[in-house]
Amino acid sequence: MAKDAEDFKTSYESLWTELRILYEYDQISENMLLNPIRRIIETFTKFNALDKTTFCNKVSGAKKLFDVNSHSIDDIEAELNGKTKQEIIQMFYDCFEKNEYGTHFFKYWGNAHVDENGNLVMSSEES
């Protein structure tokens, strides 16, 4: 059991690390963030016995955006609707925050904070 928990922790942390790296590199397109986000949400909701749809539906457009390319690659560009990496990560954060798991997001994301308007602000320091 302890080995399974350790494997889960390592895999889950790796998803967050992957997401942060993809976010930070300018050469990486916005759509590359969606797969690790979807995998993080699926893992998090399953591990915590939460309904994934309910978790995402508290943020307008999140479920649709984060499900893009989960079954087909054809619609990915059309579905982004011009969202920036910052807007995508904001939606991702909002899903955690609106489900009362904002501290969980910060534990894994690293250096960031929320401004007085509820916007996620990234730190310029390495995490």
Give, region by region, the residue ranges found by the protein language model.
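Acidic, Mg2+-coordinating catalytic modules of nucleic-acid enzymes
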Residues: M1-S127
